[in-house]
Amino acid sequence: MAALDGLPPLRDVIQRHGLDAKKALGQNFLLDLNLTQKIARTAGPLEDVTVIEVGPGPGGLTRAILALGARKVVAIERDPRCLPALAEISAHYPGRLDVVEGDALKVDFERLAEGPVRIIANLPYNVGTQLLVNWLLPERWPPFWQSMTLMIQREVGLRIVAGADDDHYGRLGVLCGWRTKARLAFDVPPQAFTPPPKVTSTVVHLEPIDNPIPCAVSALEKVTQAAFGQRRKMLRQSLKSIGGEALLGKAGIDPQRRAETLTVEEFCRLANCLLGEKVPRSGAAPLRTGFPSEDR
């Protein structure tokens, strides 16, 4: 691909700009430009599309996206050391690369780009799951993005595509199953990165479901958080803080079942019962927010 876009090999770019990957930023750089092209192709045709990329680093995936014809790339980069390398790419593709320096968790993505938008990113390991959840949970749906093609830890990828009765099924699987069609595209071994991470990565592709089961985001979050927060307990116990057996009875769900056996439709039914009717509460402590790993 170096011959395709006329820019130097990524290893040379990294050495010239002194871009040693920082663990604190969750950085692992991809050096294989053929692999970055494969990731970009997984997103589908990119002509007339604006692509949002998070954590471009030295720009390997950025170059692949632009070479495959994306109308524009809007890249969010937190590390100022990477900006000169990205500026070289911008000069090679005039008017087609906008770089936003900042923390992706604080960016208003809906205001970043116009027209058809796809998200393609090698997500930093330390913020990848939270970014995905943020993109899944806007009240307004369908979302601003047409698809997401993300490279993440394989463990997270398995959680994204998991369904009921799968060992990897949890809160993330419910949210993704509720609002998207998700598939694992291919795995990426640690040796493809510098420095090599300790885990295998995977590329996952998600497309929004235009008309998901009607359900309030806030209620579904409460139900899944309570259920999977004590995933080995029966639902009558794990849901005690939000109504327990009374809530389960209204939803027509056996209180002796466990969280991992419920389908997405059943979780939505519980959420709608929680929102639509007053259910006795036990006075338990407020629910936490976020997606800690033990809740999956």
From Swiss-Prot:
S-adenosyl-L-methionine binds at N28, L30, G55, E77, D103, N122. It comes from the Bacteria. GO terms for cellular component: cytosol. PROSITE patterns: RRNA_A_DIMETH (PS01131), SAM_RNA_A_N6_MT (PS51689). The keyword Kinase does not apply. It catalyses: adenosine(1518)/adenosine(1519) in 16S rRNA + 4 S-adenosyl-L-methionine = N(6)-dimethyladenosine(1518)/N(6)-dimethyladenosine(1519) in 16S rRNA + 4 S-adenosyl-L-homocysteine + 4 H(+). Keywords: Cytoplasm, Methyltransferase, RNA-binding, rRNA processing, S-adenosyl-L-methionine, Transferase. Its EC number is 2.1.1.182. CDD domains: AdoMet_MTases. It is found in: Cytoplasm. SMART domains: rADc (SM00650). Its main location: cytoplasm. One of its GO terms (molecular function) is RNA binding. Specifically dimethylates two adjacent adenosines (A1518 and A1519) in the loop of a conserved hairpin near the 3'-end of 16S rRNA in the 30S particle. May play a critical role in biogenesis of 30S subunits. Belongs to the class I-like SAM-binding methyltransferase superfamily. rRNA adenine N(6)-methyltransferase family. RsmA subfamily. This is Ribosomal RNA small subunit methyltransferase A. It comes from Sinorhizobium fredii (strain NBRC 101917 / NGR234).
